[in-house]
């Protein structure tokens, strides 16, 4: 592989998540989203919650997830769940690349995940479902505002 190909392989996304709601777009930290798109450059790609929320003196306040030393992050993407009722678990789901295609794995989240409206996991049980180009991912309950579309096949991911 030449240097240019190596650079492109490292920098270009293998897939993306497209934010489908304003709430989903606002949940993504600055620097992780561009034009409503989140780049996925490696698999598994792990997603979870960045912060907790609480009502203090009648106002919603967010407390950040503590970081301990040089510990490796639990997620590749930390979403900010701004609602008073949390939809997103700290370690919610991951996207895997397999020989057969892509797989969404719920990592034992409390509220579960949906793939095109089909419930995966929830009640801390975990679960998995095939994930195809164009599928919609809902993070949390049926009424979650955190919805994304999975777009695959951008470059080869050495499956």
How does the language model describe each region?
Residues 33, 74, 91, 101-102:
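Hydrophobic alpha-helical segments, principally membrane-spanning helices and signal/leader peptides
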Residues 47, 94-103, 108-110, 114-159:
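C-terminal boundary/linker segments immediately following FHA domains
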Residues 1-86, 135-136, 145-159:
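Intrinsically disordered, low-complexity acidic Ser/Thr-rich regulatory segments
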Residues 37, 92-94:
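Short, surface-exposed charged micro-motifs
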Residues 82-83, 90, 125-126:
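A structural connector/turn signal
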Residues 30-31, 86-88, 122, 130:
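Short solvent-exposed loop/turn micro-motifs enriched in small/polar/acidic residues
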